[in-house]
A protein has these predicted regions:
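Face-selective signature of the C-terminal outer-membrane beta-barrel domain
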Residues: 75-79, 83-86, 118-231
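Flexible, solvent-exposed coil segments and beta strand-coil junctions
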Residues: 45-56, 65, 103-116, 167-181
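Outer-membrane beta-barrel and related beta-rich outer-membrane complex signature
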Residues: 31-40, 85-106, 110-112, 155-165, ...
Length: 231
């Protein structure tokens, strides 16, 4: 297993009360696991009510997971009363799985050994970015405008999952559900939007102040799903 990461950031003065700053963080990790065990699923009951073993499979699972993530942000003062900031996030994780099962499947045959394999590759991706602005004292007045624009993408991609089973008649391929299948899946969601508000002061006295905020929000989201199965 391996995991590394790092960060880089700084800020600079641009003069006249303005500054620019940024921060970047990135990480990478890889993890490999192997699990073994015994699966005795779907037991039956004896006449006295005790559990009786129905299926018995020796199982082995190998998995390799990789994760990459990046986070960045930057902010700049355009003037003493106006600033813009940017945020971006990216994450991608993948899994490569191999599953092996061998033993007695009573629903197929109690007199022969059944062997099952499943290979699977799975990837998940997340991306998000946001741009924000804050503008004070517009036109030498006390008006304040704030706005935010954003976009995001989420995806789950399974480009290949295949399963096969052997048993009976000299370990021949079993023509049954879950054997000789290939499955593909792709789920994706996209979002983007914009939000803005204008702060308008009404009055300000020693006893208090009053203001009104006007604004609006727009958001669009769409999702697509594609599944295919071959046998």
């Amino acid at each position: 297993n391996l995991s590394v990461g790092g960060s880089l950031g700084n800020s600079h003065s641009l003069g006249e009360g303005r500054r620019f700053g940024y921060l970047l963080t990135a990480g990478y990790g890889i993890d490999t696991t192997r699990e073994t065990g015994i699966n005795r699923y779907r037991p039956t009951f004896d006449t006295d009510g005790s559990l009786v073993e129905y299926n018995r499979l020796r199982t082995e699972l190998g998995q390799r997971s990789v994760d990459v993530n990046v986070l960045g942000t930057a902010s700049v003062d355009l003037t003493a009363d106006s600033s813009i900031s940017l945020l971006a996030l990216f994450n991608r994780s993948t899994e490569d799985n191999v599953e092996f099962q061998q033993g007695t499947l009573a629903e197929i045959s109690t007199a022969s050994i059944t062997t099952r394999w499943q290979l699977q590759y799975l990837a998940r991706t997340l991306f998000f970015t946001q741009l924000r602005g804050d503008h004070r004292n517009l036109g030498n007045t006390e008006l304040r405008l704030r706005w935010t624009a954003f976009a995001g993408l989420g995806r789950r991609d399974e480009p290949d999952r295949r399963s096969v089973a052997y048993g009976q008649d000299n370990n021949r391929w079993l023509q049954r559900a879950g054997s000789g299948e290939r499955f593909f899946s792709d789920l994706e969601q996209r979002d983007f939007g914009f939000d803005t508000n204008l702060q308008v002061p009404l009055w300000s006295t020693s006893a208090g102040e009053a203001q009104v905020t006007l604004g609006g929000t727009f958001r669009h989201s769409e999702r697509t799903l594609l599944n295919r199965r071959f046998r």
